[in-house]
Swiss-Prot record:
One of its GO terms (molecular function) is rRNA binding. InterPro entries: Ribosomal_uL6-like, Ribosomal_uL6-like_a/b-dom_sf, Ribosomal_uL6_a/b-dom, Ribosomal_uL6_bac-type, Ribosomal_uL6_CS. Keywords: Ribonucleoprotein, Ribosomal protein, RNA-binding, rRNA-binding. Pfam families: Ribosomal_L6 (PF00347). Part of the 50S ribosomal subunit. This is Large ribosomal subunit protein uL6. HAMAP family: Ribosomal_uL6_B (MF_01365_B). This protein binds to the 23S rRNA, and is important in its secondary structure. It is located near the subunit interface in the base of the L7/L12 stalk, and near the tRNA binding site of the peptidyltransferase center. It comes from Anaeromyxobacter sp. (strain K). GO terms for cellular component: cytosolic large ribosomal subunit. Belongs to the universal ribosomal protein uL6 family.
Length: 180
């Protein structure tokens, strides 16, 4: 049996969980979300707990068992606490500005770059306009959005200019040594 999948997930206070066929719906103080589950795995809600069980002992079902339990746990944690990811912008003149559901970047191109935030994701920029914080209740959507923002101008290895995750370290390279 899956060591992760066999553990029940406790439902926190002020959170509603419902299972409608193969769709799990979670509502909490920070928001609501839903996600589909595979037919090889069943999800039941009883006595303040969510339990995940698999239909058979196939290799795929065993893998989906632990995955589904972790997705349920992440959804419950997301609607209670929420998730956030920090990004840093390095480079002369590089900055970001949030305008409604858009983030306007100045990244050294001949034009400003406009990034549209998906529904359920919010962004905030510090006073220096170099630190960007992205928040969401959906951990998966947050990671995808942060990766897309980073891909606008990934950090380069010589000077480190670009957009990087706050906890990321860039392996720096030494430049060419000029022969005189």
């Amino acid at each position: 049996m899956s060591r992760v999948g066999k553990l029940p997930v406790k439902i926190p206070e002020k959170v509603k969980v419902s299972v409608d066929g193969n769709v799990v719906k979670v509502e909490g103080p920070k928001g609501k979300m839903h996600f589909p589950t595979n037919p090889l795995v069943s999800v039941q809600v009883d006595k303040g707990e969510v339990k995940v069980a698999r239909q058979d002992e196939s290799h795929v079902a065993k893998g989906l068992h632990g995955l589904t339990r972790t997705l349920v746990k992440n959804a419950l944690e997301g609607v209670v606490k929420g998730y956030e990811k920090g990004l840093e912008i390095n480079g002369v003149g590089f900055k970001a500005e949030v305008k409604g559901k858009d983030i306007h970047f100045t990244l050294g191109f001949s034009h400003p770059v406009v990034f549209k935030l998906p529904d359920g994701v919010t962004a905030e920029v510090d006073a220096k306009q170099t630190k960007l914080t992205i928040r969401s209740v959906d951990k998966h959507l947050l990671g995808l959005t942060a990766a897309k923002v980073r891909a606008l101008r990934p950090p380069e290895p010589y000077k480190g200019k670009g957009i990087k995750y706050a906890d990321e370290t860039i392996r720096r390279k030494e430049g060419k040594t000029g022969a005189a």
